[in-house]
Amino acid sequence: MPLSTSLLGKKSTYKDSYDVTLLFKIPRINNRNELGINSNNLPFYGVDVWNTYELSCLNKNGKPWVGVGTFYIPTDSENIVESKSFKLYLNSFNNFVVESVKELERIILQDLSNVTHAKVTGRIFPINTKVEFGVPSGKNIDDLDIVCNNYGAPDNSLIEYEDVLVEEEINSNLLKSNCLVTGQPDWGTIVIKYKGKKLKHDSFLKYLISFRNCNEFAEQCAERIFTDIKNAISPDFLSISIVYTRRGGIDICPYRSTDKSYTLPSDKRFIRQ
């Protein structure tokens, strides 16, 4: 189903009973073809981490239960799930009786796996789970004194490098783009770790800021940045993680790495989450 004929980006009525058909799948191949990424031979490994903060159902006595969930969609899944459709889907559990939290977890994981055509993992947590805030790892480049004038479309020609090999980790809180469906802003913190020719921090910050008015899904923004860095400096190692702020009770955190045995960054939330 094309986006134009879906309910996405339109006024929606919340269902009062569980409805898996609310999940709207989007093939990854469409955006990857645009980026020149071969879906049969991906240049990266990774996952999209989805954190859900508005999750509720009824127990067998009709009493509401609330919690939060974290779900991991592998980067080699055939499809992604559009975030608004996921929100509508989760809210369809609000008046649905579930025997246990484990049963709710099983249903959601099974539905996501079926829609994405991949093995989705995750867990649902009680609302009183203790949470600690963290800070992005690496060197922050946001205070560099630069002049910016490109906000129309991501401009990879802004990426410059020095002909010296380094291994470093940098981060920025200035990444911002817009949802392809709704046009609503997506605010992100990005952490880049790489080994290769040294990125010039000032020009790279300009590059990140050039996403400011870009209309793309969070996952595509992550893969565009990964691809642009890879094409620019041909690093021996590269990983990027983006932590987006929540919208509609959901935040999406894409992670991409050249390392098959990658380890996800800390699961501590940043202050904007």
UniProtKB/Swiss-Prot annotation:
**What does the record give under GO molecular function?**
preQ1 synthase activity
For this UniProt record, the keywords arranged alphabetically read as follows: Cytoplasm, NADP, Oxidoreductase, Queuosine biosynthesis
SUPFAM superfamilies, per the entry? Tetrahydrobiopterin biosynthesis enzymes-like (SSF55620)
Q: What is its EC number?
A: 1.7.1.13
Q: Does the keyword Protein transport apply?
A: no
Q: Name one GO cellular component term.
A: cytoplasm
Pathway annotation from the record:
tRNA modification; tRNA-queuosine biosynthesis
Q: Where is the active site?
A: C179 (thioimide intermediate), D186 (proton donor)
> What's its catalytic activity?
7-aminomethyl-7-carbaguanine + 2 NADP(+) = 7-cyano-7-deazaguanine + 2 NADPH + 3 H(+)
Compartment list: Cytoplasm
Which residues are listed for substrate binding in this entry? Answer: V81, E82, S83, A218, E219
**Top EC group:** oxidoreductase
Sites binding NADPH sit at: S83, K84, R247, G248
InterPro entries per the UniProt record, alphabetical: GTP-CH-I_C/QueF, NADPH_dep_7-cyano-7-deazaG_red, QueF, QueF_N, QueF_type2
Supply one GO BP term.
queuosine biosynthetic process
Which family is this protein grouped under? Belongs to the GTP cyclohydrolase I family. QueF type 2 subfamily.
Subunit-structure text = Homodimer.
- Alphabetized PANTHER family for the sequence: NADPH-DEPENDENT 7-CYANO-7-DEAZAGUANINE REDUCTASE
Q: What does this protein do?
A: Catalyzes the NADPH-dependent reduction of 7-cyano-7-deazaguanine (preQ0) to 7-aminomethyl-7-deazaguanine (preQ1).
Protein's name in the database? NADPH-dependent 7-cyano-7-deazaguanine reductase
